[in-house]
């Protein structure tokens, strides 16, 4: 769940462009490390069917701008045990895979906003591919 973008400016400026793009989309920045060219947004929740997914966006600026979805899903446990208050009925699992439809709904607005701000999406990241 990674997308890559090329940039033709300084690393600091590319990080600032990415930050402003995410802020324009309504994300809130949780952690920003300008000296490491890295930032992470606050956790956001989204429902798909009966599952709830929480995700955050991580951005790392190196040779390219890497946009990564870090996600976890909440799963309803169907155990025979009962709990008072129901707090143990939901289990959180780290998920490195989100449904494709959900990935698209997250990445499409980011792609559009980054492109509008001068960051160009890399279509082919394989070795030997022309930039």
PLM features: residue spans?
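Ser/Thr-rich, low-complexity intrinsically disordered terminal regions
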Residues: 1-131
């Amino acid at each position: 769940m990674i997308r890559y973008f090329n940039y033709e400016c300084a690393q600091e400026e590319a990080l600032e462009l990415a930050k402003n793009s995410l802020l324009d989309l309504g994300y809130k920045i949780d952690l920003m490390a300008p000296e490491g060219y890295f930032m992470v947004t606050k956790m956001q929740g989204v429902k798909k069917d009966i599952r709830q997914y929480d995700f955050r966006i991580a951005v790392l600026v190196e040779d390219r701008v890497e946009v990564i979805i870090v996600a976890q899903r909440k799963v309803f446990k169907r155990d025979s045990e009962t709990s008072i208050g129901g707090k143990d009925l939901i289990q959180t699992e780290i998920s490195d895979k989100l449904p494709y439809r959900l990935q698209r709904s997250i990445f499409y607005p980011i792609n559009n906003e980054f492109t509008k701000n001068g960051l160009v999406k890399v279509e082919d990241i394989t070795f030997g591919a022309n930039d």
